[in-house]
Curated annotation (Swiss-Prot):
Molecular function GO labels: structural constituent of ribosome
Family of this protein: Belongs to the eukaryotic ribosomal protein eS12 family.
Protein name per Swiss-Prot or TrEMBL: Small ribosomal subunit protein eS12
Stretches assigned to coiled coil: none
Top-level taxonomic group: Eukaryota
Subunit structure: Part of the small subunit (SSU) processome, composed of more than 70 proteins and the RNA chaperone small nucleolar RNA (snoRNA) U3. Subunit of the 40S ribosomal complex.
Amino acid sequence: MSDAGGDVQVAPAAVAQGPMDKEGALRAVLRAAHHADGLAKGLHETCKALDKREAHFCVLAENCDEPQYVKLVETLCAEHQIPLIKVADKKIIGEYCGLCKYDKEGKARKVVGCSSAVVTNWGNEEQGRAILTDYFASKN
């Protein structure tokens, strides 16, 4: 085999598209945690992870159907000093956690709502992790 050929340029895996905000960091971290099998979705899994103190942080929907669910998750987070992020809609959490189908254009379709989620393994998203840890530090 000869080396007759031009140089092959490889595109970087993730191109930085400017500074990442809290929402973008949350989306990236939840997707990375989903791929690394470090995401607990739903009330039952969330409460188990919070009780075992395995959670790095928790995400809770503000439009949760049951006020007792909200109270339970907030209390567990406060008791175990686990950071809590509130999101406006449970469909947003469902989309970020991968509970949806994507069409040809890459838009989320048939999104299933998710009231709460917990990250137990960060995955390989370093930029989002740094932004969220800075956010948690500034919040306290």
